[in-house]
Amino acid sequence: MKKIMTICLICILCGSMVQAQKIRIKTGIEVLKEQNFKCLEGKRVGLITNPTGVDNHMKSTIDILHEAPNVNLVALYGPEHGVRGDVHAGDHVTDMKDASTGLPVYSLYGSTRKATPEMLKDIDVLVYDIQDIGCRSFTYI
């Protein structure tokens, strides 16, 4: 009887592992892409992100939205470390232009820790893409 129970338990565990491997988790940017960015169409889009904002191929959300023909990405907002992760911990992030896209990058970790009305004046919708597992505190969450 003990042997039969052990075999049953092994079969159940193996079956669960096979099933778990078939499930694919999608990031928010992948869902938006699958929907052809329909909810962003016709809007001026601002993106709050950092280097964790990527799809399953590690492509930056900045680049994905910038390259999408029906998305009007007009500004980026960078928390600590900046939108591309090129600022050291604790250093102030300054407003600048993104070298890759030419878009304005507004700092959320410089003289202000939140977007000002001036930073938001040309934005219809904000997309927030910062991935985290939620077990630590950060200045940008």
Where are these regions (language model features)?
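N-terminal phosphate-binding or glycine-rich loops at protein starts, especially the Walker A/P-loop
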Residues: R24-V71
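Redox-cofactor binding/interface segments in oxidoreductases and associated redox assembly factors
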Residues: G78, Y128-D129
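Conserved acidic residues
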Residues: V45, V74, D124-V125
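Bacterial Sec-dependent N-terminal signal peptides
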Residues: M1-K22
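A cross-family phosphate/adenosyl-ligand binding-site feature
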Residues: I23, H81-V83, H92-T94
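Short internal beta-strands
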Residues: N72-H81
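Glycine-rich oxoanion-binding loops at beta->alpha junctions
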Residues: A89, V93-I123, C135
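Glycine/threonine-rich flexible loop motifs
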Residues: D132-I141
